[in-house]
């Protein structure tokens, strides 16, 4: 999993996978991890051996319940792939992940087309202004038609959904791109990258993840069109990483709290600027109840396993031990004064735990 000095990444990118349930999102993640050399063979949801569905309940039910990550190299970039739940009951878990994404891949079933939750996800991606690639899966099933599906994507999602095999469609999304196409017969990679980053176009790829069809093309597209405008600093007004004068100051956004099998509390965060080092003193809390705690350990997870590092740089997603008072959405460092985006979705299921009188709920 980690990177050697020979493969030191030029940039760190976080890419989220989102989908309506049963669209083949986890199967796509298995294909991506297989083709990038992270796993020896793709697992299957129905076999209960998917790399990222590693909780017993997930394997038992065949669904993703918790967002999890895997790390792989793609060209000169280190990519953190965040697999999110597709089931509507766990949408709040998915939405918390959006605030730390640089790009997203929306998976659509070619057999079912744009479904209700697909539109919800699309609206969320627009709300958080996340550049989005679309992968139309299950194109090997009888009755699927690429032309009809692309037409549906344009009608129900956005007219700027473009087939990346049709350069003329790309050119119509921007006046400068059209000039390039008319003069040179193609649109430059830099122009396409900027159009994707600005959400002017949404690249569409078609395939069948179970058979690894179209997955490499998707990876090639991400590797080619993800620009250098990421992993510099997080601008809450834009909900994305942007360059500014505070790039050397530490900043981070917490998106998840969990515990490892040993009971250690893990604060999952994205480093938005500067860097975080082991034993760094972090501050947070309200003015009336401030806290200061040290980052005991910095972990980079990939599936169930992790490696510890001495520092995490801007753009990296890590889990930190030793922090007892952090909460999802909290900003640390220069992010402390920036309000997190208020979640649009709420958990469908709610539980309340009652402790016996002799038990202190705060400990």
Provide a role label for each language-model segment.
Residues 1-363:
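Structural and coupling elements of P-loop NTPases
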């Amino acid at each position: 999993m980690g990177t050697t000095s020979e493969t030191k990444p030029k940039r760190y990118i976080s890419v989220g996978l989102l989908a309506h349930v049963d669209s083949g999102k986890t199967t796509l993640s298995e294909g991506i991890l297989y083709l990038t050399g992270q796993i020896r063979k793709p697992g299957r949801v129905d076999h209960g051996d998917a790399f990222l569905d590693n909780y017993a309940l997930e394997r038992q039910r065949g669904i993703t319940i918790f967002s999890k990550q895997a790390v792989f190299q793609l060209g000169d970039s280190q990519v953190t792939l965040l697999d999110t739940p597709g089931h509507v009951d766990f949408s709040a878990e998915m939405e918390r992940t959006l605030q730390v994404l640089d790009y997203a891949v929306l998976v659509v079933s070619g057999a079912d087309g744009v479904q209700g939750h697909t539109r919800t996800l699309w609206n969320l991606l627009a709300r958080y202004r996340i550049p989005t690639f679309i992968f139309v899966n299950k194109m090997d099933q009888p009755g699927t038609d690429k032309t009809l599906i692309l037409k549906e994507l344009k009608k129900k999602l956005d007219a700027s959904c473009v087939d990346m095999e049709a350069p003329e469609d790309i050119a119509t999304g921007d006046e400068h791109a059209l000039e390039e196409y008319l003069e040179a017969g193609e649109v430059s990679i830099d122009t396409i990258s900027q159009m994707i980053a600005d959400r002017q176009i949404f690249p569409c790829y078609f395939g069948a993840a179970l058979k690894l069809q179209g997955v490499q093309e998707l990876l090639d597209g991400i590797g080619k069109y993800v620009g250098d405008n990421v992993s510099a600093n997080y601008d809450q007004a834009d909900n994305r990483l942007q360059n500014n004068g505070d790039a050397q100051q530490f900043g981070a956004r917490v998106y998840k709290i969990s515990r490892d099998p040993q009971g250690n509390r893990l604060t999952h965060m994205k480093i938005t600027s500067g860097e975080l080092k082991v034993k760094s003193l972090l501050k947070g809390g309200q003015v009336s109840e401030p806290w200061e705690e040290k980052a005991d350990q910095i972990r980079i997870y990939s599936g169930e396993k992790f490696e510890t590092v001495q520092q995490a740089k801007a753009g990296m997603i890590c889990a930190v031990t030793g922090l007892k008072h952090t909460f999802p959405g909290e900003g640390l460092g220069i992010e402390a004064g920036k309000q997190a985006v208020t979640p649009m979705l709420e958990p469908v299921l709610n539980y309340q735990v009652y402790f016996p009188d002799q038990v202190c709920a705060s400990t």
